[in-house]
Design a protein with these regions (language model features):
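Terminal, low-structured helical/coil segments at or just beyond the last alpha-helical repeat
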Residues: 2, 135-185
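Structural marker of alpha-solenoid helical repeat scaffolds
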Residues: 55, 89, 122, 155-156
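TPR alpha-solenoid repeat register
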Residues: 62, 96, 129, 162-163
Length: 185
C-alpha cells in the first residue's frame, strides 16, 4: 500500500516535467525573474532569482538582480550580501560595484569611495559614479575635488545638474582696509 502513493507522486512528477519540457535552467529562471521584476512583481522575481542561484550559485546576474530586488524592498543588508556575492564571481561587474557603493556610503564612506573609483577605472563615463564620488569627497572637506567630480558628472549627463548642490566658490581672502593714520580725532 505504501508504495502506490510514492509511485503516483513519481508519475505526477514525471508527467509534470514531460508536459513542461526540460527543467528550467538558471539562465531561464533569471530571464523569468527579470520579466517579473520589470512587471513590478518583486515577490516572484525574488523567489525566481533564488531558484536560479540554487541551480547555479555562480550566476552573477542572478545575485545582482536579487540584490536590486532587495534594495527596492528596503532590505539593504541582504542587497549588500548579493552585490558582494556578485563581485566574488565577477569582480568587474560595474553595476554591482556601484550599487554596493551606494548601499555602504553612509556606513563606510572610505570603502564606498574605493568602490566608486573602481567603477570609474572600469567605466570612466559612469556619470552617477562621478556625482556620488563628489558627495563623498565633499563630506571629507575637499570642495574643489567635489566640484570637479560634479562637473564631470554633469558633462556626461546634463540631467544630473539638478542633483549638484550649490556651494559658493571660494573667495580671495583680503586684508581689511584700514584708514591711514591721522592726527585728527
Amino acid at each position: 500500500m505504501k508504495a502506490k502513493p510514492m509511485m503516483l507522486a513519481a508519475a505526477v512528477l514525471t508527467i509534470g516535467v514531460a508536459a513542461c519540457g526540460t527543467p528550467p535552467t538558471a539562465q531561464s529562471l533569471v530571464s523569468q525573474g527579470l520579466k517579473a521584476q520589470l512587471a513590478g512583481d518583486e515577490s516572484t522575481a525574488e523567489s525566481t532569482y533564488q531558484q536560479a542561484i540554487k541551480l547555479d550559485p555562480n550566476n552573477a546576474v542572478a545575485h545582482y538582480n536579487l540584490g536590486t530586488v532587495y534594495d527596492r524592498q528596503g532590505k539593504t543588508s541582504q542587497a549588500v550580501t548579493e552585490y558582494t556575492a556578485t563581485l566574488v564571481i565577477s569582480p568587474s561587474f560595474t553595476d554591482a560595484l556601484f550599487n554596493l557603493a551606494v548601499d555602504t556610503a553612509t556606513s563606510d564612506p572610505a570603502g564606498a569611495q574605493r568602490l566608486y573609483l573602481r567603477v570609474l577605472a572600469l567605466q570612466p563615463t559612469f556619470a552617477a559614479a562621478w556625482l556620488n564620488l563628489g558627495f563623498i569627497v565633499r563630506d571629507e572637506g575637499k570642495l574643489a575635488e567635489a566640484r570637479t567630480d560634479w562637473a564631470k558628472a554633469v558633462a556626461l549627463d546634463a540631467s544630473l545638474a539638478s542633483h549638484v548642490p550649490t556651494i559658493p566658490a571660494p573667495t580671495a581672502v583680503t586684508k581689511p582696509v584700514t584708514p591711514p593714520p591721522t592726527s585728527q580725532p
